[in-house]
Swiss-Prot record:
It comes from Frankia casuarinae (strain DSM 45818 / CECT 9043 / HFP020203 / CcI3). GO terms for biological process: translation. PANTHER family: CHLOROPLAST 50S RIBOSOMAL PROTEIN L22-RELATED, LARGE RIBOSOMAL SUBUNIT PROTEIN UL22M. One of its GO terms (cellular component) is cytosolic large ribosomal subunit. This is Large ribosomal subunit protein uL22. PROSITE patterns: RIBOSOMAL_L22.
Length: 141
């Protein structure tokens, strides 16, 4: 995935910033469900989606997206209105293994999974409302 940003530039060559949360006590598969909601969206829209998402992992992802936006604003002097969620991914962290006692001397293994959540925001020019829905007409031959 993405290593570190080189001179404040993302992989796509756009200015941006990175934030990550490591060893978060949420399953990577559940965190990926939430991360997929915000990939490629503007930071403001992503934060709105995460604020009202019913999944428990949305709170952790919200904090990382907000931190990446703050890093871009404070460390690289980027305008928050032009920030987009460029790269966002969840890696698997170490699994905590616990034991649950069961009947007749048995024991079940409980696996408490952890995640590393990484968000890279990049500064793009905002798409105007007129440019988004404009259609080109074909000339008659």
């Amino acid at each position: 995935m993405a290593d570190d940003l080189v001179d404040g530039l993302t992989r796509a060559g756009l200015p941006g910033a990175k934030a990550s949360a490591r060893y978060v006590r949420v399953s990577p598969t559940k965190a990926r469900r939430v991360v997929d909601l915000v990939r490629g969206r503007s930071v403001g829209e992503a934060l709105d989606i995460l604020r009202f998402a019913p999944q428990a992992a949305s709170e952790d992802v919200y904090k990382v997206v907000a931190s990446a936006a703050a890093n871009a604003e404070n460390n690289h002097s980027l305008d928050p209105a032009t920030l987009w969620v460029g790269e966002v991914y969840v890696d698997e962290g170490p699994t905590l293994k616990r034991i649950r006692p069961r009947a007749q001397g048995r024991a079940y293994r409980i696996r408490k999974r952890t995640s590393h959540i990484t968000v890279v925001v990049e500064s793009r020019e905002p798409v105007s409302a007129a440019g988004r829905g404009a259609k080109t007409t074909r000339r008659a031959r």
